[in-house]
Design a protein with these regions (language model features):
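An aromatic- and histidine-rich active-site surface loop
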Residues: 78-123, 127, 285
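Conserved donor-binding/catalytic core segment of Leloir-type glycosyltransferases
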Residues: 9-10, 194-226, 232
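Nucleotide-activated donor-binding/catalytic signature segment of Leloir-type glycosyltransferases, i.e.
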Residues: 244-265
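Membrane-proximal helix-turn-helix segments that form the acceptor-binding/catalytic region
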Residues: 91, 137-154
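A short, active-site helix/loop in glycosyltransferases that binds the activated sugar's phosphate group
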Residues: 147-175, 181-183, 363
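Short hydrophobic beta-strand element within catalytic cores of glycosyltransferases
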Residues: 276, 295, 299-302
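Aromatic "clamp/platform" in nucleotide-sugar-dependent glycosyltransferases that forms part
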Residues: 282
Length: 390
């Protein structure tokens, strides 16, 4: 099928507008950006139903074609069903295929065999996450290899991810493009009152409550002493989850568990007015929550690993266990000048590396290379003029 210029299909997310994680937010930003620059953009959207009545339908949202795919399956099987139906439908439509994540990469060879151009964001190293049982980790491991070899072009959102992918494909096949963010220069303090909080009198963690995000380490470290400040742990807790119960049991009376908050204005206010942001992620690349903390000017206390060191730069105090985390928290709560320096460094780092426009332009250059009449081989594809990402 001959591909016209400036036509893109985005798959791998639940759809737009964004109601879930970082990939959905990126898909919305990128689709709107391209639509405003004359591209024909379609985004696949998952529609969960009890009974399939209309397998595929489309509408137009803010200049973007949304392709709704119905699935009656639940959980992981529903996601796979959706991924397969997206691939099958994409065979009937022109355009470069931008795939966000590799969880359903087993179906990508169908696109390549049909001569389609595939550009895949490889996300984090999902198969390393301890929360997954062995069969699921094996599935992700195999899919990572399939995506790496099926896609003409790979994107890593962090240099360490690009290094990892170089064990699967030639390094020339991968371009580094991180996640983006927007400056937060003000936010109302009103949302804090409902949680019993005062500006600059608390620190905040915003993450899924999972072992590889070190939530238990953070809660134990904060609760090791009387702080005179509060720790806000934002995330969904489940009553039947043993790890969640352990986190709650470790908390002092200065720890607040508001649950999951999906109102972006409230989350933005919680970040902006926090004395520091605690980030325990250990697996993945450029984490959206950490980028957003930098844009909010947060002093950062982060787990010491290559992902967080590169992303936060000089804006972070680093920890690797309960003791070092407790020491970093105590330092951030006691030293006003240090917090000011870290806050300034956070904004400088965000402006230098994580502007949305830089990110979106870099993605567009890659898609243009793939959409060109003869296509771009990995070694020929355009590199972003941003050496700080390499």
């Amino acid at each position: 099928m001959k591909q016209p210029q400036r036509t893109l299909l985005i798959m791998g997310t639940r759809g737009v507008p964004a109601n879930h994680g970082g990939f959905e937010t990126f898909a919305e930003r990128y689709a709107l950006f391209l639509a405003g620059r004359g591209w024909s953009v379609s985004v696949y959207c998952q529609e969960d139903v009890e009974e399939i009545t209309e397998p595929v339908r489309t509408d137009v949202w803010r200049g973007i074609t949304r392709i709704f795919i119905q699935t009656a399956r639940k959980g992981g099987l529903g996601a796979l069903d959706f991924d397969w139906k997206c691939v099958r439908d994409a065979l009937t439509r022109p355009g470069v295929c931008l795939v966000l994540g590799y969880n359903g990469a087993a179906f990508l060879p169908v696109l390549r065999l049909a001569g389609r151009k595939v550009f895949t964001n490889m996300d984090g190293i999902e198969w390393k996450r301890p929360k997954w049982p062995l069969p699921v980790r094996a599935w992700f491991y195999v899919n990572e290899w399939i995506a790496a070899w099926t896609s003409q072009r790979l994107v890593a959102d962090h240099p360490a991810i690009a290094t990892h992918l170089s064990t699967r494909r030639s390094r020339k096949a991968t371009v580094v493009i991180p996640y983006g963010g927007d400056p937060v220069v003000e936010a109302p303090a009103a949302p804090l009152a409902a949680l019993g909080l005062e500006p600059l009198r608390y620190v905040v963690s915003i993450a899924r409550i999972e072992p590889d995000n070190n939530i238990l380490t953070i809660v134990k470290a904060f609760s090791a002493a009387k702080r005179g400040f509060k720790l806000v742990v934002l995330g969904k807790f489940e009553d039947d989850n043993a790890y969640h119960a352990e986190v709650r049991a470790a908390a002092s009376d200065e720890v607040v568990f508001p649950g999951a908050i999906y109102d972006s204005a409230i989350v933005r206010a919680l970040r902006f007015h926090a004395r520091a942001y605690l980030h325990g992620h250990t697996v993945g690349g450029t984490n959206p929550s950490l980028v957003e903390a930098l844009w909010a000017g947060n002093a950062v206390i982060a787990h010491d690993n290559p992902y967080n060191r590169w992303t936060a730069g000089a804006a972070a105090l680093l920890f690797n266990d309960v003791g070092s985390c407790a020491a970093a928290i105590a330092l951030a709560l006691a030293d006003n000048e240090l917090v000011t320096r870290l806050s300034e460094a956070a904004r400088e780092r965000a402006a230098a590396a994580f502007k949305w426009r830089d990110v979106l332009v870099a993605y567009e250059r890659e898609c243009l290379a793939l959409a060109s009449p003869r296509g771009a081989q990995p070694e020929e594809a355009l590199q972003p003029a941003t050496p700080r990402w390499v």
